Amino acid sequence: MRTTYMAKPNEVERKWYVVDAEGQTLGRLASEVASILRGKHKPTFTPHVDTGDHVIVLNASKIQLTGNKLQDKIYYRHTNHPGGLKQTKAQDMRANKPERMLELAIKGMLPKNTLGRKQGMKLHVYAGSEHNHHAQKPEAYELRG
């Protein structure tokens, strides 16, 4: 009888990928990056083991939103004080913290558990086209969509 392959944490080989977000749609880019972070693009994918790769996302400030989402979409956060609900429009978020906008979209597509938080730490988002991970020799990743 054959058994299903289960990757072991010490056997996993990690690569570094660079993704250019310029002109990409937020949700479509986020779903592909989340898939890479989880390791679903590998034949050795195992749901309970972190088999994913590191992803560097560049040009987060040039991400696109479809329709009227740039004016209508609202991001909420709470200060944990009474009456401390804060809201930010997507337009302001893209102008002030474009990295945060992309991080929220990608991390929202990862599992909500310890493994998902560990996978989310392999995400590196930059607003501009420069990054400081040249020592890891990242390779360009061509998006499917």
UniProtKB/Swiss-Prot annotation:
Keyword Coiled coil on entry: no
Gene Ontology biological process terms in this record: negative regulation of translation; translation
Keywords attached to this entry: Ribonucleoprotein, Ribosomal protein
Pfam families linked: Ribosomal_L13 (PF00572)
GO molecular function, one term: mRNA binding
Gene Ontology terms: cellular component: cytosolic large ribosomal subunit
Subunit note: Part of the 50S ribosomal subunit.
NCBIfam families: rplM_bact
PANTHER family named among the record's database cross-references: LARGE RIBOSOMAL SUBUNIT PROTEIN UL13M, RIBOSOMAL PROTEIN L13
Family to which this protein belongs: Belongs to the universal ribosomal protein uL13 family.
Function: This protein is one of the early assembly proteins of the 50S ribosomal subunit, although it is not seen to bind rRNA by itself. It is important during the early stages of 50S assembly.
Protein name: Large ribosomal subunit protein uL13
Organism of derivation: Shouchella clausii (strain KSM-K16) (Alkalihalobacillus clausii)
